[in-house]
Amino acid sequence: MSWTQENVDFLRGLGKRSITLNDYVKAYYDVEILPYDISLNPILQKVIDRVYEITKEAFDNPQHEYYYAPNRRINEYGNHVEDVLCQAIEDVDGTEAKNLGVGYPDVRTKLGGYFLYPECKISSNIDEVGSMRSFYTSVPAERTKKIKNLQDGMHILFKFHHNGPGVLTGRHKVFDLNGMQYVSEALQQGNDKNVYACKMLFG
């Protein structure tokens, strides 16, 4: 027999399930997502303004730290804008925006006495609400949990409108992710070591 009842029962319990981001951070980091505090509005607006200032300063200036060449891939521009956002936070508030590494959340800062976890996205059409995946989380390794060391805090998502690599148009949307619902899906994955450990029929 190549299956076990325990694994069968486990797999049958998996599948699509609607969860909240709050569930995710509580389950894996044992922390709470706090509702956005509107007292942060003025400083957040300054941060957004600074993002555009840095982008304009860097545009067409290859010597600038945040220059983004027009021939670079657009799907890497989102990570670049996130770096600009981190710099903008430091410029405006003097607070370090720390990169936490791969996996959600990947940036932490502190504004107005609150821990803030900003997520940054770009889009050529920020008014379009599509069904393509634009946000995801994954089960963190124990080492990742220790490195990220999450605290209770606010989780917000910046979505900037772009007109090609290196060009932000000045339009944006900012979302409070507290209570955000999304779908948890079971995923099984293997590699060639798993396959090659099987009985080979030809070859």
Task: Write out the residue ranges for each language-model feature.
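Active-site beta-strand-loop-beta-strand hairpin of nuclease catalytic cores
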Residues: 108-117
